[in-house]
């Protein structure tokens, strides 16, 4: 007599198959979910990378969303010129044209009365005259001696355009805006059949205690370093060189037991600013022992070695380093493509899916 399954047994087999199928689907789904943590000291470019993900992997910023950044563009522009004027007093730099002193006084009055999201023709005129002044330019060239937004020159050089009454910020204007990240900003997007969850965490010291609960189940960490920070001090601690702070932080992340199996991707960012700065500000400010030339290639390679040498598990853990310019969409697109390939190779090969 043949061996036949009872209806009950058949149901049990079907149930078992379904459970296996569900487990496999759950496994595949989990394998396709990528949790990325963006870490780094304050103003290293983390939030700009997040904005680029929206531009590259989503539809970018709509006209309506761009309009909402108008107030931030104006605020960044006004705060930048104010920071330069204040620094002139501290650094004892005179205006090239004595008449600009009246403009400076006017600037503080008009800026204080300015309505959010609006720039009057009078205020724009004052800022334009000040920015053209040789004393203001001399102070701008010494910006490493005080705190100034990276985007200062970008906005101030383009004042004619951004001061127009019908001005709508471009994607590039939005990328250049600076708003301090407080707390954690989460972004979702799909790329190469993977579902990314990217977490941007505030980099200032006061924000770092909020990181800890993000650590669980992280696929990869993108650690951002501003190359151009080598001759700057922290906004929150003027005794601390920004690059040294970044190295300390990278050391603690790279060698953390939480991240033994986590891919570490190092973005040496702001390469465009670094390339300009290294011509006039020597790397020995940050690394007194540096004996190389102040060329972009040699100085950048030296900084790369300083960070990669902090890795105490070189035999088992690789650091994937990329030189980036977070405001350059094509560069970020190219680098992120390479990063995704590393993630696929490292984190999904175990599942036999790729």
Curated annotation (Swiss-Prot):
Catalytic reaction list: GTP + H2O = GDP + phosphate + H(+)
Residue positions bearing lipid (S-palmitoyl cysteine): 3
Positions of the G-alpha domain: 32-354
Gene: Gnai1
Membrane disposition: Peripheral membrane protein; Lipid-anchor
EC number(s) on file: 3.6.5.-
Lipidation (N-myristoyl glycine): 2
Segments of this protein annotated with the region G4 motif: 265-272
Protein name: Guanine nucleotide-binding protein G(i) subunit alpha-1
Principal subcellular localisation of the protein: nucleus
